[in-house]
């Protein structure tokens, strides 16, 4: 359940820290509406066997983004949930797809600012 705790605490803390800044962007009448985009996976809409913690965390993240969209959308902040599937090349996935080509895994820098 550590995965669920990580998804929940990280996303909520990030939202709490960024939404006040995004609301300021609305007040400044930015040319582009401020946006908060969460990245999910197909697991957020379809469960997989042996992935209960991951599935639960992704479902929770999708629910959070949906709730925030309903709460902050009318105030001018766009909140979205994008499904991006693939194995991210991190130490935990080192052995996954090891015999596949160099493009089989996603570079972590291509999906986030690190």
What are these regions (language model features)?
Residues 1-6:
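Active-site Tyr-X3-Lys motif and surrounding loop/helix of classical short-chain dehydrogenase/reductase
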Residues 8, 12, 58, 105-112:
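Electropositive phosphate-/nucleotide-binding environments in soluble metabolic enzymes
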Residues 9, 23-60, 65-66, 70-73:
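Catalytic loop of short-chain dehydrogenase/reductase
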Residues 14-18, 22:
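Hydrophobic positions on the long internal alpha-helix
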Residues 18, 50-53, 58, 87, ...:
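Residue-level preference for alpha-helix termini and adjacent loops
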Residues 19, 54-55, 63, 95-102:
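Generic alpha-helical propensity signal that fires on short helical segments
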Residues 74-90, 94-114:
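C-terminal helical subdomain
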């Amino acid at each position: 359940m550590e995965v669920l705790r990580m998804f929940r605490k990280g996303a909520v803390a990030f939202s709490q820290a960024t939404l006040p800044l995004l609301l300021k962007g609305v007040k400044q009448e930015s040319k582009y509406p401020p946006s908060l985009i969460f990245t999910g996976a197909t697991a957020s809409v379809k469960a997989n066997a042996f992935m209960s913690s991951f599935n639960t965390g992704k479902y929770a993240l999708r629910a959070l983004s949906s709730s925030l969209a309903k709460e902050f959308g009318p105030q001018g902040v766009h909140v979205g949930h994008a499904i991006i599937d693939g194995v991210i090349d991190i130490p935990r996935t080192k052995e996954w797809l090891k015999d596949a080509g160099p493009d089989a895994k996603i570079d972590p820098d291509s999906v986030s600012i690190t």
